[in-house]
């Protein structure tokens, strides 16, 4: 449903989803599958702790990343490749109470985030309903290359948010 083109939540099928399982693994949308048409065969099962080990790496090549992702698969014979955002999902799922991540690129939000004034416009809430739906504030991450750099920056921003507000953010 997140990938339904009529909803405008995922430009050109981009975006990813993940779901945490009780055993410390998670399902993640595999590379090459679109949100609009994905079914149960479009997900790869990953070990959360093994993916989170990437946070300890500083400079990692794309080739090394692929090897580490292969080692983090629940089924080493699974030919599906995890999304480049596997670490971003693992980070989000590692926080207390988070069981599902819907990482989308909504058309209406992208039109706002591409504006030079966006960071300033994001500050503060105007309406009580906005606070209920989006929280007291949002996590804002400046454009960063996808993969490990984006995941690490997102973790830094989430942790800063938690220190400031004492809760995990509702919107990023």
Regions found by a protein language model. Name each.
Residues 1-172:
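Glycine-rich flexible loops
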